[in-house]
Swiss-Prot record:
This is 2-isopropylmalate synthase. Catalyzes the condensation of the acetyl group of acetyl-CoA with 3-methyl-2-oxobutanoate (2-ketoisovalerate) to form 3-carboxy-3-hydroxy-4-methylpentanoate (2-isopropylmalate). Pathway: Amino-acid biosynthesis; L-leucine biosynthesis; L-leucine from 3-methyl-2-oxobutanoate: step 1/4. One of its GO terms (cellular component) is cytoplasm. Pfam families: HCS_D2, HMGL-like, LeuA_dimer.
Length: 531
């Protein structure tokens, strides 16, 4: 990737920067599931993690490199600070990939130099040069980021970039680390780099931005107009603080407004060639997968993938859409993988019909996963007259993409009413196989269930978020529950779906506790090793 592409390179950092969002902790299997889906989506580069950060991160990057980093698959990248041990760990982690990249960085803004690094400008230039060259000794594909470039002195930034490229960097990434710039300012930064870094034609200009002022996507589109050819983004825009630039918004903005962006890439305005390598029909499925596994709900009015993105309440709008969708919709929902073809299954539907419909919806399940999902399908079909595609999606996500199965819900029973004190009895199977039962009184049925579960699990935690969403309409709709709980300074999420919202609430809570419990077990093992 040392030559200027005629299209935009999509660099997905959902598994690295996106996972830094509080509560979005993922285990290795979940990261692998997302990485596989990102490959189907068609991203060019997957930043699989920060290999040096922890043994778990290293293993995740290594496993993704082994499994997803095929010859025809995406480039697998690991982040590394501008330090020898970081870069060495990154190189080792990405080694199994057919195409690997090391992404190293050091801050260049005066505030970071003074307070964080406590280094002078010449020292930072020397470190950048040395560490890029060191990374280059492991792989030809090296990306360099001057952290907080948006607040860096332009002249100093040009010097650092020139030396990094001379040392072997093939991609120069310009991060707006704190989401501080406006579109015109960010565009000017990219333009300045194009005009003032003598060897810039030897590298691809990339951009990375946060959404603190809600301007990340707008900044990136302005950067494209000024010469940026790689965009670093996340699914659903998840990430630290207010999040990152959203992949789905960037891709669809350039797809819908292709005639506007074509000339900036040297194309004829009417060219129909896609500006990215993304299979847009995989966008919605990828969004749902990331939302379910991270526990980060997508707001209903979120552009492109929100529940209301293609909904119309106004009578005038509804009338126009019925006559011609283009009156009030600038894109077809089918472009992102939504479909009006809602084939309905029921309790008499067989395993073959179930398998066939899941394949049509894009789910690729192993035989074991299919069996688990089919058992759940039959349970739901006994309670629900018709099972829609939305229900199938919820069933698969709930059964297949779950937390470690340490504690298991065996029984949930509640008693409540207008003049009764809400009481819950729960039975959990422990990691040792023992069944424990306890009961509790709460302010409501869910509170009572959670108190009873806590009495069994006995791990202190604080529930900080509880939300319920209906998958479909109707009194027999499946309800999806997402919860987040805090243990010390860490946040863990849980997700579950069921036609009984109390059962879904119990399962979601246990899923979050299982993530917490697994994390504590990992900590204990690491403590034993270092002791």
């Amino acid at each position: 990737m040392t030559t200027k592409p005629e299209r935009i390179i999509i660099f997905d950092t959902t598994l690295r920067d996106g996972e830094q969002c509080p509560g979005a902790t993922l285990n290795i299997d979940e990261k692998l599931a997302i990485a596989k889906q990102l490959a189907r989506l068609g991203v060019d580069i997957i930043e699989a993690g920060f290999a040096f950060a922890s043994p778990g991160d290293f293993e995740a990057v290594h496993k993704i490199a082994q499994t997803v980093g095929t010859e025809n698959g995406p480039v697998i990248c690991s982040l590394a600070r501008a330090r020898h041990d970081d870069i060495k760990a990154a190189a080792e982690a990405i080694k199994p990939a057919a195409k690997g990249r090391i992404h190293t960085f050091i801050a260049t803004s005066d505030i970071h130099l003074q307070y964080k690094l406590k280094k002078t400008r010449p020292e930072v230039i020397a470190i950048a040069e040395e560490m890029v060259a060191y990374a280059k000794s492991f792989t030809d594909d090296v990306e360099f980021s001057p952290e907080d470039a948006g607040r860096s002195d332009p002249e100093f930034l040009y010097q650092v970039l020139e030396r990094a490229i001379a040392a072997g960097a093939t991609t120069i990434n310009i991060p707006d680390t704190v989401g501080y710039t406006t579109p015109s300012e960010f565009g000017a930064i990219i333009k300045g780099i194009k005009e003032n870094v003598p060897n810039i034609d030897q590298a691809i200009i990339s951009v990375h931005g946060h959404n603190d002022l809600g301007l990340a996507v707008a900044n990136f589109l302005e950067a494209v107009k000024n010469g940026a050819r790689q965009l670093e983004c996340t699914i659903n825009g998840i990430g630290e603080r207010a999040g990152n630039a959203a992949l789905e918004e960037l891709v669809m903005a350039m797809h819908v407004r292709r005639q506007y962006f074509n000339p900036f890439l040297g194309r004829h305005p009417d060219s129909e060639e896609p500006l990215t390598n993304i299979d847009t029909k995989q966008i919605y499925k990828t969004s749902r997968l990331v939302s379910n596994l991270t526990g980060m709900l997508v707001q209903p009015n979120k552009a492109i993938v929100g529940a209301n993105a293609f909904a119309h309440e106004s009578g005038i709008h509804q009338d126009g859409v019925l006559k011609n969708k283009l009156t009030y919709e600038i894109m077809d929902a089918q472009l992102i993988g939504l479909t009006d073809n809602q084939i309905v299954l029921g309790k008499h539907s067989g395993r073959n019909a179930f398998r066939t419909r899941l394949k049509e919806l894009g789910f690729e399940l192993s035989e074991t996963e299919l069996n688990k999902a089919f058992v759940k399908f039959k349970e739901v079909a006994d309670k629900k007259k018709e099972i829609s595609d939305w229900d199938l999606e919820a069933i698969v996500n709930d059964e297949i993409q779950q937390a470690p199965d340490l504690f298991r819900v065996e029984l949930v029973q509640v008693s409540c009413g207008s003049n009764a004190r809400p009481t819950a009895t729960v039975t959990l199977r422990t990691p040792d196989g023992e069944e424990l039962t306890d009961a509790a009184i709460g302010t409501g049925p869910v509170d009572a269930v959670y108190k009873a579960i806590n009495r069994v699990v006995n791990v202190p935690n604080q529930l900080i978020e509880f939300s319920v969403q209906s998958v479909t309409a109707g009194i027999d709709a499946i309800g999806e529950v997402t919860i987040r709980l805090r243990y010390e300074s860490r946040v863990f999420s849980g997700h579950a779906a069921n036609t009984d919202i109390i059962v879904a609430s119990a399962q979601a809570y246990v899923n979050a506790l299982n993530r917490l419990y697994a994390s504590l077990q990992t900590q204990d093992k690491q403590t034993e090793v270092t002791a």
